[in-house]
Amino acid sequence: MMVESKTPLLDTVNTPEDLRKLDPSQLRQFADELRTETINAVSVTGGHLGAGLGVVELTVALHYVFNTPADRLIWDVGHQCYPHKILTGRRDRIRTLRMGGGLSGFTKRAESEYDPFGAGHSSTSISAALGMAVGRDQLGHKNHVICVIGDGSISAGMAYEAMNNAGAMNSRMIVILNDNDMSIAPPVGAMSGYLSRLISSRQYRGLRELGKQVAERLPRPLQEAARRAEEYARGFVTGGTLFEEMGFYYVGPIDGHNLDHLLPVLENIRDDQGTGPVLIHAVTQKGRGYGPAERSADKLHAVSKFDVITGAQAKAKANAPSYTRVFADSLIQEAEADSRVVAITAAMPSGTGLDLFEKRFPDRTYDVGIAEQHAVTFAAGLAAEGLKPFCAIYSTFLQRAYDQVVHDVCIQNLPVRFAIDRAGLVGSDGCTHAGSFDVAYLGCVPNIVIMAAADEAELKHMVATAAAYDHGPIAVRYPRGEGVGLEMPERGQVLEIGKGRIVKEGTKVAILSLGTRLKEALLAAEDLNARGLSTTVADARFAKPIDEALIRRLAQDHEVLITVEEGSIGGFGSYVLHFLAQSGLLDQGLKVRPMVLPDIFQDQDAPAKQYDEAGLNARHIVETALKALGTGLAAETPAARA
């Protein structure tokens, strides 16, 4: 007996070309089936749920009205792209989302022609869309360029830079503001839907243009009065004055879940022959159509595998606290002892653990929104006034504020504390979120101190060290995930700046680890010792300043020195090699082997598999030592595999 499909319409659609064969009256059912498929898929894989559910109707309408992929459709960030992926020939692989060898959790150019621009970080879509629109015009093409950006992402400076530029140009592009927080929109309903359809219509645009031509014949004061009156009237009923002032033709707000509103507005804009940018303001609900996600939009923004009926997430029992939790608890402890400790996050309070800090110290917590550049300089201002700011930002997002780190913090030697979460490889979020580069891009800047926690106890000590350090900027990096299960000290101890530690003594091979590869270094030492190769293991603790006395000792007392780090080329290993070369410690035959992440962008997978692919596990350290000593052959290198 055949089981009746729960998605009969969706089963007939593999690409948007198939979708456009449906009658408009079928689209409501199609959207419901697409939402069901999205929920079922994410329940198996985990991922970003709420954002995608909020744009199901918008996704259907955009692909139905516009001729994708010839018409470019860009999704900002990419959190909301799962329905788009299902609809663009990837349904058969949707249950591989964020897995090794599977679909990326974000849009990705290499994955589909329907992903014209990749994402992962926020607020890039308007800039990319404008570039594509100008490129189209230069080449004499006629396709549309559309980008979808959320009300959170549009608050970032880059989005306003792009809008400011776009408003001064004649290139036609369409920006869809996906407002799922009601932070900008006035109430939506039948009247606003009618006004949006009216304002987007060719007749209205024609009358407006005629009015401008008539006004141009009036004396200049009357021209200005007419312009302001028209803007005031439109702003009164639509709320789009800000975007109009930036040079956009504003349409909205419209109900982003009402296909009867979406379709005619999009068709009107598609068919209009005008020039310049258009902004369509669509109000949506995050988690739409799935009760648990609607009730807890923040908790079901990003989820692990979950039960579709209850929404309960299947989280494995933790063997140790997460590094993020250890950081938060340690910072709370320091703040209880010192009222000058304050915390800054750039729209990631729960991701960085500062939601816990905020519960304890609401008046000492600052969420500045998606504004990493501002966050860093804001922290610099706090430090200049004698406070102790901890700026908690993921490694990958701190890249966005590099000039502020250099110009506003380090040149002025202001004591800003950087808590760099998600350092190293991050698993299912893939290359856009990997924290591979911070040691390299911070280590070349004067005045900054850089620490890397080997385990959760070390992280607690490093938070205490950062709180006590008032001589300039200081950073502590730590990974995503759980600690190693150590007994935690009651209080963090202040570490001596630039001093590492010997963890295991040996005589022939020295392994100098920075960060949480220390556990793998100790496992490698056990293997090497079992082979009769006495091995020292040291924890560098500091990437800058490096412990020159420790490195000198390791170089002079061992035949082989291996550095291991969860970072790119140009980082800690380079600093060690530079010191060894400058000190003449390479002149007596010391064999130095730096082990770093391969010089590639690694795709998503389980973190353990990523590090195995990167060649940074215990067996790789053993192979490196054996090859250096000439007593064994190393396995194929990550670079060769790539």
Curated annotation (Swiss-Prot):
Cofactor names: Mg(2+); thiamine diphosphate
Domain of life: Bacteria
GO biological process: 1-deoxy-D-xylulose 5-phosphate biosynthetic process; glyceraldehyde-3-phosphate metabolic process; terpenoid biosynthetic process; thiamine biosynthetic process
InterPro entries documented for this protein: Dxylulose-5-P_synthase, THDP-binding, Transketo_C/PFOR_II, Transketolase-like_Pyr-bd, Transketolase_C, Transketolase_CS
Binding-site residues, Mg(2+): 151, 180
The protein's Enzyme Commission number: 2.2.1.7
Keywords: Isoprene biosynthesis, Magnesium, Metal-binding, Thiamine biosynthesis, Thiamine pyrophosphate, Transferase
Catalysed reactions, as listed in the record: D-glyceraldehyde 3-phosphate + pyruvate + H(+) = 1-deoxy-D-xylulose 5-phosphate + CO2
Binding, thiamine diphosphate: 79, 120-122, 152-153, 180, 290, 372
Cofactor binding, note field: Binds 1 Mg(2+) ion per subunit.
Molecular function in Gene Ontology: 1-deoxy-D-xylulose-5-phosphate synthase activity; magnesium ion binding; thiamine pyrophosphate binding
Pathway: Metabolic intermediate biosynthesis; 1-deoxy-D-xylulose 5-phosphate biosynthesis; 1-deoxy-D-xylulose 5-phosphate from D-glyceraldehyde 3-phosphate and pyruvate: step 1/1
Top class in the EC scheme: transferase
PROSITE patterns for the chain: TRANSKETOLASE_1 (PS00801)
Ranges in a coiled coil: none
Pfam families: DXP_synthase_N (PF13292), Transket_pyr (PF02779), Transketolase_C (PF02780)
NCBIfam families: dxs, PRK05444.2-2
Entry's family note: Belongs to the transketolase family. DXPS subfamily.
PANTHER family according to UniProt: 1-D-DEOXYXYLULOSE 5-PHOSPHATE SYNTHASE-RELATED (PTHR43322), 1-DEOXY-D-XYLULOSE-5-PHOSPHATE SYNTHASE, CHLOROPLASTIC (PTHR43322:SF5)
Subunit relationships: Homodimer.
Descriptive protein name: 1-deoxy-D-xylulose-5-phosphate synthase
